[in-house]
Regions:
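RNase H-like, metal-dependent nuclease domains and their acidic two-metal-ion catalytic environment used
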Residues: 1-87, 95, 99, 109-161
Length: 161
């Protein structure tokens, strides 16, 4: 059995930063294996991302450009190599993040590893998101990071009208 793919999603917003890690097995549900929260400071986030990449060179890392994301990306020395992505969508284009989460929750396509310290905060963020998809309050960085971690980052299927 092959090792699961590992995705790390990095988000910084006005209320703080988050890194969410999800493992993608060859078959079955994705598992959120880590939820890390940070103050609104690029330095510790950059150091953690560098450590994650050093520990798992084959992992995929996506950085949200909003908030301090552009600065985090810059401090990571523009990692425009395989396994890195800067998520640069703004405004209405970001609604896809909500869609990804709502579909994943409804389909139960991911779960949480047992004992995650921030799992309850994540669940509160998800409830807030389902009530108000444009919410920008505390915890919204968790929901955005989760969406980026569980999305496969392929172009969306064409819409049929």
């Amino acid at each position: 059995m092959s090792a699961p793919l590992v995705h790390h999603a990095v988000v910084t917003r006005g209320h703080g930063g988050a890194i969410v890690t999800a493992e993608w097995p060859a078959e079955g549900r994705q598992t959120v294996t880590a939820i890390e929260r940070f103050s609104y400071d690029a330095g510790p986030i950059v150091r953690r991302v560098q450590q994650l990449k050093a520990d798992h060179p084959d992992c995929f890392i996506v950085v949200d450009a909003e908030g301090l994301g552009d600065a985090v990306w810059e401090l990571l020395d523009h990692p425009r190599r395989r396994g890195w992505r800067l998520y640069q969508k703004h405004g209405l284009e970001r609604e896809e993040l909500t869609r990804v989460l709502l579909v994943a929750v409804e389909r139960s396509s991911f779960g949480f590893a047992p004992g995650l310290p921030e799992e309850q905060a994540m669940k509160r963020a998800l409830v807030g998101l389902t009530r108000n998809p444009r919410a920008e309050g505390p915890g919204s960085e968790l929901a955005v990071a989760l969406s980026l971690a569980i999305d496969d980052h392929r172009p969306p299927a064409p819409r049929i009208y």
